[in-house]
Amino acid sequence: MSETYVSEKSPGVMASGAELIRAADIQTAQARISSVIAPTPLQYCPRLSEETGAEIYLKREDLQDVRSYKIRGALNSGAQLTQEQRDAGIVAASAGNHAQGVAYVCKSLGVQGRIYVPVQTPKQKRDRIMVHGGEFVSLVVTGNNFDEASAAAHEDAERTGATLIEPFDARNTVIGQGTVAAEILSQLTSMGKSADHVMVPVGGGGLLAGVVSYMADMAPRTAIVGIEPAGAASMQAALHNGGPITLETVDPFVDGAAVKRVGDLNYTIVEKNQGRVHMMSATEGAVCTEMLDLYQNEGIIAEPAGALSIAGLKEMSFAPGSVVVCIISGGNNDVLRYAEIAERSLVHRGLKHYFLVNFPQKPGQLRHFLEDILGPDDDITLFEYLKRNNRETGTALVGIHLSEASGLDSLLERMEESAIDSRRLEPGTPEYEYLT
């Protein structure tokens, strides 16, 4: 892993998980929230089943009223507030989905709430928060990431006496998220099947901890696979370190899972179940590719975190006929992001490349580039050039979309043989990051 860590192991980590969550706790929560939210579908996916050789089922949490599983933990927490706590109000921090769940709870209970979200939260999610909360919710946009927004929410709760509903590191929240697993097992049982693997997206770890807790009691032979964004793999960092630590930086693209530090309780639950939990990472480019595939093939609008389970699926091999459940955790994606999503996917698949090309300042050079260097099915998607009459050459920024990823080597060979000087911009360089 390339992240730099700041060691912050909490001395109370193990103590916080001393009273681990049992299946009975989750079943009680399921009964508590079942009058408000209906079970989400568990759908067989022919395309992914054919690609993997396994039986792939999608748990459609993107079809919740708030388009995310987060309503489960928020509702389980809010339903247990005393009248005194309701009168004092609710505070929450979220990258967007938990906020919508809390907003839904505030409106349904008639409780005032203040919700803190980081500045990179998509406008679509901000708007949906207000739709669900209406006049019962005020939105506070602050901080460059979830952790900074969370710090502001904690300060608010301490100052005002409002109840803070945690997005992932609280017992009632984790128990609520665990009802996803209870539904999965019930739905599979009704089909006469049992799960061999459950693929779980991971940010702060609340969903993973809830699923692991339920499966440990009710389906101990089921393997749980947690998938984190490669740019925010905080659970893997915690397991490697022996306790939760804070990543110095995270890539905010997978906004629903861009968490610098996993929850202490969630870490404890996962650590105690390492024999049945496997952790892995998915690159942001792989996530984008799966988002597009889900939309184009199944008509599913998944947010980046919602596609993590599918991105992880593609990196694994399964015994033929294995039953694998992928949790599509959310569908709150801003349509304005799809241009960036498509770009990242093309780069990930090796179809999009950028070059700095030094054209001699004389007629016919661009025609030469197009005819002799570019492949017959390749396309120029970006061309920025400013002619300078007082120079022998002029530099152009050129983006090329290849018809096949395998065509890169021959393109580079033609560039090498050409009299026109060119340089490929490598991923990870400042120029490249600026473009993508």
Swiss-Prot record:
Reactions that this protein is recorded to catalyse: L-threonine = 2-oxobutanoate + NH4(+)
Superkingdom in the source lineage: Bacteria
Subunit structure: Homotetramer.
Keyword Lyase: yes
Functional summary from the UniProt entry: Catalyzes the anaerobic formation of alpha-ketobutyrate and ammonia from threonine in a two-step reaction. The first step involved a dehydration of threonine and a production of enamine intermediates (aminocrotonate), which tautomerizes to its imine form (iminobutyrate). Both intermediates are unstable and short-lived. The second step is the nonenzymatic hydrolysis of the enamine/imine intermediates to form 2-ketobutyrate and free ammonia. In the low water environment of the cell, the second step is accelerated by RidA.
NCBIfam families: PRK08639.1 (NF006390), THD1 (TIGR02079)
Protein name in UniProt: L-threonine dehydratase biosynthetic IlvA
Annotated region (Catalytic), positions in chain: 1-357
Taxonomic lineage: Bacteria, Bacillati, Actinomycetota, Actinomycetes, Mycobacteriales
Organism: Corynebacterium glutamicum (strain ATCC 13032 / DSM 20300 / JCM 1318 / BCRC 11384 / CCUG 27702 / LMG 3730 / NBRC 12168 / NCIMB 10025 / NRRL B-2784 / 534)
